[in-house]
Amino acid sequence: MITVKRIDEKDWDAFTVESLFDEIKATKGQTTGQLINGDDVPYIAAAKTNNGFAYMCSAKEHPEWVSNGNTIVFVQLGDGAAGLAHYIPMDFIGMNGKTASGYNAKLSENSGVFIARCLSSNKAIFSHGHSWTGRRLLSTKTMLPINDDGEPDYDYMSKYTQKKRESLLIKYQEYARKRVVDLGENSEIPKMDQKNWDAFLISDIFNICFIFGK
């Protein structure tokens, strides 16, 4: 496993979004109504779950809507998501006015994940009435670990994230092995037609609320 300093052993400093990225571009999609399901690129929405991933779509109908990957996507507007940042490794489609993408030649997948997480710590500042756009976006500051020259330590951020990935993988593998032992090597899950079935009222399963108007 990679050996890397603890977070609290590193020196940190504040950096603005404007200073971190060589380019910040608006995403190019115009309307989700014209997206067609496919397997070309992901649609990255202004969302707070699944790293913004909504679904896979075709790029053939609107190739001009595709943004380059290896970028950090800024959620500028959205239902509880404004102020979040997502690292996106591959080309994608985002909706203009809702997201923007930042590019930095030094960015890698691991350092991108690290920086996106740090930027997302500003989420509480932004909302529908206080969007993450214009000067508010460019002047947003985030704390990052620095190297001996006082610059963002991309090498450290990459190694730290990789170590976290490896640590989580070990935990998942240990859990999977334990579950196999608990279940027994020859355990079988019954087929659907081998289970007993019965009818239930929807109200027995869900709490149903009726909402009238606004």
Q: Could you tell me what each predicted segment is?
A:
Residues 55-113, 117:
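A short beta-sheet element
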Residues 12, 38-41, 69, 90, ...:
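Sequence-level motif detector for i,i+2 pairs with an aromatic at +2
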Residues 1-31, 35-51, 149-214:
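Non-catalytic DNA-recognition/assembly elements of restriction-modification systems
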Residues 88, 95-103, 115-147:
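Glycine-anchored helix-breaking recognition loops at helix->coil/strand junctions
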